[in-house]
Amino acid sequence: AVYIASPIALHAMQAIKMMMHGKHVLCEKSLASNLAEAEAMFRAAEDNNVILMEAMRPIHDPGYALIKKNLKKLGRIRKIYLNFSEYSRRYNAFKEGEITSVFAREMSGGALMDVGVYCVESLIGLFGMPEKITSAMIPLKTGVDGAGKIIATYPGAIAEMDYSKIT
Protein backbone atom coordinates (compact mmCIF):
# COMPACT_ATOMS: atom_id res chain seq x y z
CA ALA A 1 0.00 0.00 0.00
CA VAL A 2 1.05 3.59 -0.54
CA TYR A 3 0.14 6.85 1.16
CA ILE A 4 -0.13 9.91 -1.09
CA ALA A 5 0.31 13.32 0.56
CA SER A 6 1.41 15.42 -2.39
CA PRO A 7 -0.33 18.57 -3.69
CA ILE A 8 -3.94 17.80 -4.67
CA ALA A 9 -3.34 18.35 -8.39
CA LEU A 10 -0.95 15.36 -8.39
CA HIS A 11 -3.21 12.92 -6.50
CA ALA A 12 -5.06 11.41 -9.47
CA MET A 13 -1.97 10.79 -11.60
CA GLN A 14 0.02 9.32 -8.71
CA ALA A 15 -2.83 7.21 -7.32
CA ILE A 16 -3.83 5.78 -10.71
CA LYS A 17 -0.21 4.86 -11.45
CA MET A 18 0.12 3.08 -8.11
CA MET A 19 -3.20 1.25 -8.50
CA MET A 20 -2.19 0.11 -12.01
CA HIS A 21 0.76 -1.55 -10.27
CA GLY A 22 -1.53 -3.35 -7.83
CA LYS A 23 -1.01 -1.05 -4.85
CA HIS A 24 -3.78 -0.09 -2.43
CA VAL A 25 -3.85 3.70 -2.00
CA LEU A 26 -4.54 5.89 1.03
CA CYS A 27 -4.75 9.38 -0.46
CA GLU A 28 -4.69 12.57 1.56
CA LYS A 29 -7.68 14.91 1.30
CA SER A 30 -8.89 16.37 -0.94
CA LEU A 31 -8.94 13.14 -2.91
CA ALA A 32 -8.95 14.80 -6.33
CA SER A 33 -9.06 18.20 -8.02
CA ASN A 34 -12.44 17.55 -9.62
CA LEU A 35 -15.15 14.95 -10.26
CA ALA A 36 -13.57 13.62 -13.46
CA GLU A 37 -10.30 12.87 -11.66
CA ALA A 38 -12.12 11.21 -8.76
CA GLU A 39 -14.14 9.02 -11.14
CA ALA A 40 -10.94 7.99 -12.96
CA MET A 41 -9.39 7.08 -9.61
CA PHE A 42 -12.42 4.98 -8.60
CA ARG A 43 -12.36 3.20 -11.99
CA ALA A 44 -8.65 2.44 -11.58
CA ALA A 45 -9.29 0.97 -8.13
CA GLU A 46 -12.10 -1.21 -9.47
CA ASP A 47 -10.21 -2.25 -12.61
CA ASN A 48 -7.16 -3.26 -10.59
CA ASN A 49 -9.05 -4.81 -7.64
CA VAL A 50 -7.38 -2.53 -5.09
CA ILE A 51 -8.63 -0.24 -2.34
CA LEU A 52 -8.65 3.54 -2.75
CA MET A 53 -9.36 5.47 0.44
CA GLU A 54 -9.32 9.16 1.26
CA ALA A 55 -7.44 10.06 4.44
CA MET A 56 -10.33 12.00 6.01
CA ARG A 57 -9.37 11.23 9.61
CA PRO A 58 -12.07 13.18 11.52
CA ILE A 59 -14.93 11.00 10.21
CA HIS A 60 -13.20 7.98 11.76
CA ASP A 61 -12.80 9.66 15.14
CA PRO A 62 -14.72 8.01 18.02
CA GLY A 63 -16.25 11.41 18.88
CA TYR A 64 -17.70 11.72 15.39
CA ALA A 65 -19.27 8.26 15.66
CA LEU A 66 -20.76 9.23 19.04
CA ILE A 67 -22.26 12.43 17.63
CA LYS A 68 -23.70 10.57 14.64
CA LYS A 69 -25.18 7.87 16.89
CA ASN A 70 -26.86 10.36 19.25
CA LEU A 71 -27.83 13.19 16.89
CA LYS A 72 -31.51 12.22 16.74
CA LYS A 73 -31.75 12.42 20.55
CA LEU A 74 -31.32 16.19 20.29
CA GLY A 75 -34.65 16.58 18.53
CA ARG A 76 -35.21 18.72 15.48
CA ILE A 77 -32.08 20.63 14.53
CA ARG A 78 -32.78 23.86 12.68
CA LYS A 79 -29.37 25.56 12.74
CA ILE A 80 -26.01 23.93 12.05
CA TYR A 81 -22.66 25.72 12.23
CA LEU A 82 -19.29 24.26 11.26
CA ASN A 83 -15.97 26.09 11.22
CA PHE A 84 -12.42 25.18 10.33
CA SER A 85 -10.20 28.25 10.31
CA GLU A 86 -6.48 28.37 10.91
CA TYR A 87 -3.99 31.05 10.07
CA SER A 88 -1.51 29.27 7.83
CA ARG A 89 2.13 29.97 8.55
CA ARG A 90 2.56 29.74 4.77
CA TYR A 91 0.27 32.77 4.37
CA ASN A 92 3.02 35.06 5.70
CA ALA A 93 5.34 33.73 2.99
CA PHE A 94 2.52 34.15 0.43
CA LYS A 95 2.17 37.82 1.37
CA GLU A 96 5.92 38.20 0.73
CA GLY A 97 5.56 36.67 -2.76
CA GLU A 98 6.28 32.97 -2.15
CA ILE A 99 3.55 30.79 -3.65
CA THR A 100 3.34 27.37 -1.99
CA SER A 101 1.03 24.61 -3.23
CA VAL A 102 -1.75 25.44 -0.75
CA PHE A 103 -2.15 28.86 -2.38
CA ALA A 104 -1.44 27.79 -6.00
CA ARG A 105 -4.35 27.35 -8.39
CA GLU A 106 -2.40 24.92 -10.61
CA MET A 107 -1.91 22.67 -7.57
CA SER A 108 -5.65 22.75 -6.75
CA GLY A 109 -4.89 24.80 -3.67
CA GLY A 110 -7.14 27.05 -1.65
CA ALA A 111 -8.86 27.02 1.70
CA LEU A 112 -11.88 24.95 0.63
CA MET A 113 -9.72 22.14 -0.74
CA ASP A 114 -7.38 22.23 2.27
CA VAL A 115 -9.57 22.81 5.34
CA GLY A 116 -13.12 23.53 4.15
CA VAL A 117 -13.46 19.89 3.14
CA TYR A 118 -13.62 18.97 6.83
CA CYS A 119 -16.78 21.06 7.23
CA VAL A 120 -18.36 19.73 4.04
CA GLU A 121 -17.58 16.09 4.84
CA SER A 122 -18.92 16.42 8.39
CA LEU A 123 -22.10 18.17 7.28
CA ILE A 124 -22.95 15.59 4.61
CA GLY A 125 -21.93 12.69 6.85
CA LEU A 126 -24.16 13.85 9.69
CA PHE A 127 -27.11 15.44 7.86
CA GLY A 128 -27.02 14.13 4.28
CA MET A 129 -26.97 16.09 1.04
CA PRO A 130 -28.52 19.55 1.29
CA GLU A 131 -31.25 20.78 -1.04
CA LYS A 132 -29.41 23.96 -1.98
CA ILE A 133 -25.93 25.40 -1.58
CA THR A 134 -24.71 28.97 -1.91
CA SER A 135 -21.22 30.22 -1.24
CA ALA A 136 -18.89 33.17 -1.15
CA MET A 137 -15.12 33.43 -0.87
CA ILE A 138 -12.25 35.80 -0.33
CA PRO A 139 -10.08 35.39 -3.44
CA LEU A 140 -6.32 35.68 -3.29
CA LYS A 141 -4.12 37.05 -6.09
CA THR A 142 -3.48 33.50 -7.37
CA GLY A 143 -7.20 32.89 -7.91
CA VAL A 144 -7.68 30.47 -5.02
CA ASP A 145 -9.84 31.13 -1.99
CA GLY A 146 -8.15 32.28 1.19
CA ALA A 147 -11.40 31.91 3.13
CA GLY A 148 -15.04 31.29 2.43
CA LYS A 149 -18.55 30.62 3.61
CA ILE A 150 -21.00 27.98 2.44
CA ILE A 151 -24.70 28.09 3.27
CA ALA A 152 -26.55 24.82 2.82
CA THR A 153 -30.30 24.45 3.23
CA TYR A 154 -32.33 21.43 4.28
CA PRO A 155 -36.09 21.13 4.80
CA GLY A 156 -36.61 23.24 7.92
CA ALA A 157 -32.90 23.72 8.61
CA ILE A 158 -29.94 25.81 7.52
CA ALA A 159 -26.23 25.10 7.83
CA GLU A 160 -23.39 27.61 7.76
CA MET A 161 -19.82 26.57 7.16
CA ASP A 162 -16.89 28.96 7.53
CA TYR A 163 -13.35 28.02 6.58
CA SER A 164 -10.11 29.94 6.26
CA LYS A 165 -6.35 29.71 5.84
CA ILE A 166 -5.88 33.47 6.34
CA THR A 167 -7.70 34.23 9.61
Predicted regions and their residues:
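Beta-loop-alpha module in the N-terminal Rossmann-like domain of NAD(P)-dependent dehydrogenases
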Residues: 1-44
